[in-house]
């Protein structure tokens, strides 16, 4: 799939902007604070309906403006579509081909986007929360109903937590919440397990290629409830419910839910050693690259087209060897790259690169390479 054009009105520091894109490499160049990341943020919004930088939509509305508009035309399965977002200070509207959507879930999976930022390079060494976010975001693109399950699970988890914080705990109400957590938690677990199996196979081969066969990458799903790979969804539900029940006295004492899929993690190993504890920074970064490239391949396998890739200030964090490792595996992917250095174009075949020079919320010049 390819993003063909982008239109912004009152988005961040852009009063009005219309861009036509290269189907291969789009290099957004400018000094810090000029608006490079704002453009890729708006592209991300077209895919997920929310920002990767803030949870507050109103922060994206240009100063002294009431509403913002983001419109993106893209091709998928040889068909053109238009996604539009209109965000005001108290409202948000999303349309696909002029048809209003009722839920974010309806947007997911239309324009598939993968973002690779400096934070992703720390995926291996960061905490479980970041790795769960990595899993959840990508499954939601492939299986939009997963987002519904996750939303319902988190809502119920918050409700259960409020009950646990009461002086007098309503255990009958906890019974209801425990059943709901086990129901949605079992759906989420099964979908995570299947996703991790698939990406584990891809990433093992990917990492072997990136390291010339020297390192073997393996990833495993870590859960707290002794669920096995063979367990059915009914077995997962029963184990989850039993764990919540047996641990309820501890939850009441600690006033929090200590067990569940909100505590799961992704264990990452290099040559059978925990990469988080024993991997060098270079090994951890190469493992992160392997996981992101595998994410792209998995989406391609599932939806039969490559996603759009955003590389937000990643090259500044990588040495030249790792820059080339990354780029050499992305020849079929449309890329949007933010950089303070125009010299990064030399990594690519220059005829495939369009350079957008950005200054103070405006694209001051465009250098075309390919189509």
Curated annotation (Swiss-Prot):
GO terms for molecular function: ATP binding; single-stranded DNA binding. The keyword DNA repair applies. ATP binds at residues 30-37. It is found in: Cytoplasm. Keywords: ATP-binding, Cytoplasm, DNA damage, DNA repair, DNA replication, DNA-binding, Nucleotide-binding, SOS response. The RecF protein is involved in DNA metabolism; it is required for DNA replication and normal SOS inducibility. RecF binds preferentially to single-stranded, linear DNA. It also seems to bind ATP. This is DNA replication and repair protein RecF. Belongs to the RecF family. GO terms for cellular component: cytoplasm. The gene is recF. GO terms for biological process: DNA replication; DNA synthesis involved in DNA repair; double-strand break repair; SOS response. It comes from Clostridioides difficile (strain 630). It comes from the Bacteria. NCBIfam families: recf.
């Amino acid at each position: 799939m390819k993003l063909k054009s982008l239109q912004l009105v009152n988005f961040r520091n852009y009063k009005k902007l219309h861009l036509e894109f290269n189907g291969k490499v789009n290099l957004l160049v400018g000094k810090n604070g000029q608006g490079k990341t704002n453009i890729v943020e708006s592209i991300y919004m077209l895919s997920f309906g929310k920002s990767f930088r803030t949870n507050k939509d109103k922060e994206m509305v240009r100063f002294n403006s009431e509403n913002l508009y983001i419109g993106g035309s893209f091709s998928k399965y040889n068909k053109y579509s238009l996604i539009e977002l209109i965000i005001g200070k108290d409202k948000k509207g999303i349309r696909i081909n002029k048809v209003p959507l009722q839920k974010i879930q309806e947007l997911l999976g239309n324009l598939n986007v993968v973002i690779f930022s400096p934070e992703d390079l720390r995926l291996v060494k960061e905490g479980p929360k970041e790795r769960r976010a990595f899993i959840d975001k990508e499954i939601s693109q492939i299986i939009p109903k997963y987002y519904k399950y996750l939303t319902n699970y988190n809502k119920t988890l918050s409700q259960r937590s409020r009950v646990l914080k009461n002086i007098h705990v309503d255990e009958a109400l906890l019974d209801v919440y425990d059943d709901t957590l086990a129901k949605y938690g079992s759906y989420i677990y099964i979908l995570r397990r299947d996703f991790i199996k698939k990406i584990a196979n891809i990433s093992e081969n990917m990492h072997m290629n990136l390291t010339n066969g020297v390192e073997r990458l393996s990833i495993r799903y870590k859960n707290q409830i002794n669920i096995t790979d063979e367990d059915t969804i009914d077995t997962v539900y029963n184990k989850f419910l039993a764990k919540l029940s047996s641990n309820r006295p501890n939850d009441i004492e600690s006033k929090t839910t200590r067990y569940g899929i909100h505590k799961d993690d992704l264990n990452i190993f290099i040559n059978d050693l925990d990469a988080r504890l024993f991997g060098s920074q270079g090994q951890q970064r190469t493992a992160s690259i392997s996981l992101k490239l595998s994410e792209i391949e998995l989406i391609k396998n599932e939806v039969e087209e490559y996603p759009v890739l955003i590389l937000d200030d990643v090259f500044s964090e990588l040495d030249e060897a790792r820059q080339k490792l990354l780029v050499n595996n992305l020849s079929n992917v449309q890329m949007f790259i933010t950089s303070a250095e125009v010299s990064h174009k030399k990594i690519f075949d220059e005829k495939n690169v369009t350079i957008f020079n950005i200054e103070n919320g405006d694209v001051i010049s465009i250098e075309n390479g390919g189509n």
